[in-house]
Amino acid sequence: MQSQSVMLELREQDEVWVRLYKGERENAVFSDEYDTYITFSGHLINFQPAAEPLGTTVLHAAVDTRPQPARYFDTGTTEPVSFFLSGLEELLAWHPSSDDEFNVCAVPLAQRQPPLHSRRPRTLLCHDMRGGYLEDRFIQGSATRNPYVFYHWRYVDIFVYFSHHTVTIPPVCWTNAAHRNGVPVLGTFITEWADGEKLCEAFLAGGEDAYRAVSHQLARIAQHYRFDGWLINIENALSAAAVGNLSPFLRHLTAEVHGAVPGGLVIWYDSILESGTLRWQNELNQQNRVFFDACDGLFVNYNWKEEHLERTRELAGQRHADVYIGVDVFARGDVVGGGFDTNKSLSLIRKHGLSAAIFAPGWVYKHLGEENFLLNEDKFWGLLEDYLPTHSICTLPLATSFSVGMGTGMFLAGKEEEAGPWYNLSAQEIQPLYPERRGWLSTSCCLQDAWCGGSSLRVQGTIPPGEERVAIRLSLWVDLGSSGFSLSICGTLASGPHRDDFTVALELTTWHSSRCHDGTVTVLPSEDEPHGRHHPHLLPAPPPALSRMLAACSHGAQGWTSRCYEQELRGCSLRDLSLLVSRQQASPQETSFSCLLGELRVLDAGSMAASPPQVQSLTASQLWWQDGPSAEQLSLSLTLRWAFPPGRAACFRVLSQGARCHRAQPAQPQLLGLAHGCQYRAVGLAVPRPAPGQSCQLELLVEPVLPSELPVGPERWGRLLLVYSEPA
């Protein structure tokens, strides 16, 4: 059917319905005192957003069907999926497409301290799980029970998604989660076996134009999908002609990636020698140094001994932090240590001032099983923490509900909004908390209860005799500037047993300032204690500028208590936010405690008065009708797209207000899912089948969730109304 457009001048009170019929029927435009209708040939209706009733509205009467490209959508459900490229032909044929926009990372790379370019030894994490692209390929998440999740980002400097496909494009959920924590993400370009030799002959032995075309495409792919570079792994022998162009290829690829991706990286895997022979060296030496010199780093194979580290450190010189010594957690081959002995390998690597590359951390999940995975995962990383320097958050606002990207239900304001298992790493939130080493104190993920998302943070332990308190801190490194800064902090807590024996309070730590003013007292740090400690003021009543935030600060909601605080600071660097657990009364005995931390927000109070943006231009496309689960129902899948200022939303909640065939009050909105970009594919919506001559309507809503998690009024949501009827 030919696409048509109709332009209507709308008055404020007008409501527009667009109805498309399948079969032969004359186009008609008519109106009555209630509605304006535009009727076309076709199948379904596209309703322009109710949020923009003024001005000119363009309505497109194009018939849409299910999305076709199997690369970007699951063939059974039409859900958007992440993908890889197989072979040189697919790589060179790749080009950006509107169908692959779901695969574009929506989260910019956050700043952290110390930055990646600091010279301290780093930690690279290389994910290798059963060939890759498992449940993590479903961009909008899946109903997976007991999935593999990674959430110890504070220990990691670089993340690599590895598979044995020629071009591994990291699933966007991993890039979103890593970027939120300030961790750059690399894809993998790999060639192996006889097919790999043929591929390398085609683009390396073929001359400068051939390898430049490959490097250009790899840089374009990283730029388009917004990840940060490549691990290059040539696992096959090369001819003299091919190996002669390998270093120029790496240099050109590195330059292309640096030009296309801010902070981009290219890392070479220890495999090929300068002669073209495939022989893993387990060190940096003169036979593989030429490739190290051509890019940003070397990932050393994992069958090394301490003498390899000594020679590597000497040869690397000032670039010692660019050498990542491989550690296979599965302990394959002759290795120093893997599994729960991985710390033995890291101890030697750090002894020589080198970076580490931890390969296949999924050992915890695959070897020990799904049961007690979170407990075993925390144990694994806890054994390594002495050798893994951590990082601090550098920007505000900071808001986290401590979701690990999975759950047994979805919670909102302490109430379970949707029951059932879910898995989506894009929905993972920051977990930057570290216990102080006084008393016994532990943190763990609680899936049974949450304030928002899928989990909360369980904090439990004992205050030992002779101590008044224990603390858990959130590490920050935020320069507040000399002009002054008003911090607003909101915490949500649920107390457990012995709740009358302890109290919970907040403390701010400032650093590196000759004069730090907290609004009432100027703190002058001494040489012995170059920091100030501040106790934020509890806000009993909402000042006008904070009323939206304090609307959520109440007592007793589903067993949770929310409190908001304010602190004026000037000329400071904000370094830590600590949760202090103190005795209610002095006691010579230890005091046990347990509580759930549901949410923590640190906001710039001065920025909260601004009105949030509005969701604009909400449209529907790629519609696919099927028979429903019963004779009275249809099943509808469609893609929603909208506009919203970049960086202004943490995510979007996509809701349905229900489908109805009679004029009735709309139902309560039901959550369909979360979107982390400005598009969402609703799959398998059960809607009523209209009777002959009857029309039904479905209303869909898009609610922006701000980085501050301040509420956004419904008048700024996106709204779309679909009106449909049986074909004539």
From Swiss-Prot:
InterPro entries according to UniProt: C1q_dom, ENGase, Glyco_hydro_85, Tumour_necrosis_fac-like_dom
Any one GO molecular-function label of the UniProt entry: beta-N-acetylglucosaminidase activity
Principal location: cytoplasm
RNA-binding among keywords: no
Any matching Pfam family: C1q
Catalytic activity entry: an N(4)-(oligosaccharide-(1->3)-[oligosaccharide-(1->6)]-beta-D-Man-(1->4)-beta-D-GlcNAc-(1->4)-alpha-D-GlcNAc)-L-asparaginyl-[protein] + H2O = an oligosaccharide-(1->3)-[oligosaccharide-(1->6)]-beta-D-Man-(1->4)-D-GlcNAc + N(4)-(N-acetyl-beta-D-glucosaminyl)-L-asparaginyl-[protein]
Highest taxon in the source lineage: Eukaryota
Enzyme Commission no: 3.2.1.96
Keyword Hydrolase carried by entry: yes
Domain (BRCT) ranges: 287-381
Biological process, per Gene Ontology: N-glycan processing
GO cellular component: cytosol; extracellular space; lysosome
Localization annotation: Cytoplasm, Cytosol
Key words, A-Z: Cytoplasm, Glycosidase, Hydrolase
SUPFAM superfamilies, sorted: TNF-like
Family: Belongs to the glycosyl hydrolase 85 family.
Stated role: Endoglycosidase that releases N-glycans from glycoproteins by cleaving the beta-1,4-glycosidic bond in the N,N'-diacetylchitobiose core. Involved in the processing of free oligosaccharides in the cytosol.
Name under which the protein is recorded: Cytosolic endo-beta-N-acetylglucosaminidase
Lineage, highest ranks first: Eukaryota, Metazoa, Chordata, Craniata, Vertebrata
